[in-house]
């Protein structure tokens, strides 16, 4: 008896070449249902409809098509098992040797802003995953394909094996099939969990492997990058440069989060986008600035600390212009990310073949979701991203002297930066430019010393931001000794009064935000 291939796909790409090869080259009978059968018939291929084979019509508007013993018996039966063979003969069931199924586009459906509950529910596939799981379970005898990108692999292997599907390939395809159905069910569970806001649900996600990286943070560590296509960095387009590394991705993430504080879009002229640039090393910023255009912002960000910028990562929140590209070309950098690059900028930067240029559109960022996930031994920590809007109207003036208009602007700028610096974090800034950044010290005054020393004489007339409260008045007094005129911090220390008193004695303005921004 001729081998049988069952084909039932929502994505018709590559279907006809596969079906033609199975039938005309390898002699397969084609069994199909619904729209897939119609496509095959229109192409002139002989096909038996599932409803004809089972003797049962499609019912419930297509909800039940393939859920039938003649389908699943043919998939699950063990070849060479006498009892199974007898059951098939008694029920007039044929072996099914190849199953080609891809599932209703649930993830794509629920990603639409205007999707309704009923539309989402109707795109939950039932028969498809059931056939995939049956075929994957019986991979000793059955090959299962769930994606068009597997079709050529199957046909090439069959051509080399005289029409047979090698056992190793069947096993690999079974693995991919179970991964596919697991990811599909996870997507449904995630959507429904968010829709009904269930408390205590397990955190589920199935993220496909995008790339095996050269190594991890260090050469002796293996690393892999998992990402959904078109979501977050999975939606970035690398225009040129070497392969991305683990450290590149970590630094890009940090740089992007910070530059988005000032808006992010493909057109730097958009009112919501204040042209800004960020330079990052080891996930900490070494220079951040805003400007009248992205070129000015970039120059100011680099001027904040040109020594540390060497080998850094740059993020820009608007179109990279020719002028900005000229500045970038003069430096040794690892990566530059922006919503887009002008043709002139691309031409200028093409001379730096190893420089990684990435275009990342706002839509890909928005599709990435709100969860921040980190691993710990034997588990995960999942929290909301610390990306709530800055609300100066909710801040409190704690000092006798309120900040001046310029100080207020500088304090807002510094507060946007400090939540992206590793705790304990201190930022010294003035007129839309970071001047000194103190990160990761075990005591707050230690971070303040680093930031103030980096700012040097420029600290005079500048402001200082702290991601956590001042536990003592030492940071305020140190800041004043370097010429700082205003400070901002969350407040909440038992000794807040001491720091406020020091500000009043020394003539500093102090704002309390009421919100801490630790970063570990």
From Swiss-Prot:
One Pfam family, short name: MGS
Documented EC number(s): 2.1.2.3, 3.5.4.10
GO biological process: 'de novo' IMP biosynthetic process
SUPFAM superfamilies according to UniProt: Cytidine deaminase-like, Methylglyoxal synthase-like
Entries under InterPro entries matching the protein: AICAR_Tfase_dup_dom_sf, Cytidine_deaminase-like, MGS-like_dom, MGS-like_dom_sf, PurH-like
Keyword annotations from UniProtKB, A to Z: Hydrolase, Multifunctional enzyme, Purine biosynthesis, Transferase
Catalyzed reactions per annotation: (6R)-10-formyltetrahydrofolate + 5-amino-1-(5-phospho-beta-D-ribosyl)imidazole-4-carboxamide = 5-formamido-1-(5-phospho-D-ribosyl)imidazole-4-carboxamide + (6S)-5,6,7,8-tetrahydrofolate; IMP + H2O = 5-formamido-1-(5-phospho-D-ribosyl)imidazole-4-carboxamide
MF term (GO), any: phosphoribosylaminoimidazolecarboxamide formyltransferase activity
Ranges where the MGS-like domain occurs: 1-146
Pathway: Purine metabolism; IMP biosynthesis via de novo pathway; 5-formamido-1-(5-phospho-D-ribosyl)imidazole-4-carboxamide from 5-amino-1-(5-phospho-D-ribosyl)imidazole-4-carboxamide (10-formyl THF route): step 1/1; Purine metabolism; IMP biosynthesis via de novo pathway; IMP from 5-formamido-1-(5-phospho-D-ribosyl)imidazole-4-carboxamide: step 1/1
Cellular component, GO annotation: cytosol
PANTHER family: BIFUNCTIONAL PURINE BIOSYNTHESIS PROTEIN ATIC, BIFUNCTIONAL PURINE BIOSYNTHESIS PROTEIN PURH
Domains: entry comment: The IMP cyclohydrolase activity resides in the N-terminal region.
NCBIfam families: PRK00881.1, purH
Family designation: Belongs to the PurH family.
Full protein name: Bifunctional purine biosynthesis protein PurH
Organism, as annotated: Synechococcus sp. (strain CC9902)
Gene: purH
